[in-house]
């Protein structure tokens, strides 16, 4: 990614959904759980592993996979220079799109640590929907409009690249839903 694309991820597409998650109403089962220990940290090792190792793995694979798919689908071979070409701009746009698609899935997965994303009421947080609409509008602006392409150094991403990235996002969603299911069953077994 270029510097301006990284800034678009950090300041444009990632910030608003993260802030909207902060307005998420508490889990309905929160009062059924025992209180947290006084010495327990808010950001503990389990949370860090879930965010950066487990979910982060899927996000970190989706982005470069989109990049290399665009290159290889166009006949690129290792060692060929592609910087500042239309192919390179499309590949970085696919990378950007992979990051944003994974962020959208991640927002729904992070609404609850243990409750399935399918069980959390969809319309419960209007700020989240506004943030996601803004994030997707920014993605469309950067990838599909001439001013966005000129400003961010991108090119339109072909349908094949979107379809190639999608299984990584669906895989992340499925893996986290499976982790939540196991966590719920372990909680009931205690």
Predicted feature locations:
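C-terminal transmembrane helices and immediately adjacent loops/tails
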Residues: 1-190
């Amino acid at each position: 990614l270029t510097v301006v694309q990284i800034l678009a991820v950090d300041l444009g597409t990632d910030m608003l959904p993260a802030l909207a998650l902060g307005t998420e109403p508490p889990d309905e089962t929160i009062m059924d759980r025992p209180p947290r220990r006084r010495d327990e940290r808010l950001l503990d090792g389990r949370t860090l592993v879930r965010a950066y190792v487990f979910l982060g793995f899927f996000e970190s694979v989706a982005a470069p996979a989109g990049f290399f798919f665009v290159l290889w689908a166009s006949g690129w071979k290792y060692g060929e220079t592609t910087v500042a070409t239309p192919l390179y701009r499309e590949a970085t746009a696919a990378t950007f799109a992979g990051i944003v698609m994974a962020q959208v899935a991640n927002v729904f997965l992070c609404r609850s640590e243990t409750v399935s994303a399918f069980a959390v009421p969809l319309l419960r947080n209007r700020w989240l929907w506004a943030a996601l609409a803004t994030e997707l509008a920014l993605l469309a602006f950067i990838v599909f409009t001439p001013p966005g392409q000129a400003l961010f150094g991108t090119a339109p991403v072909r349908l094949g690249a979107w379809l190639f990235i999608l299984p990584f996002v669906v895989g992340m969603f499925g893996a986290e839903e499976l982790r939540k299911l196991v966590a719920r069953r372990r909680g009931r077994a205690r």
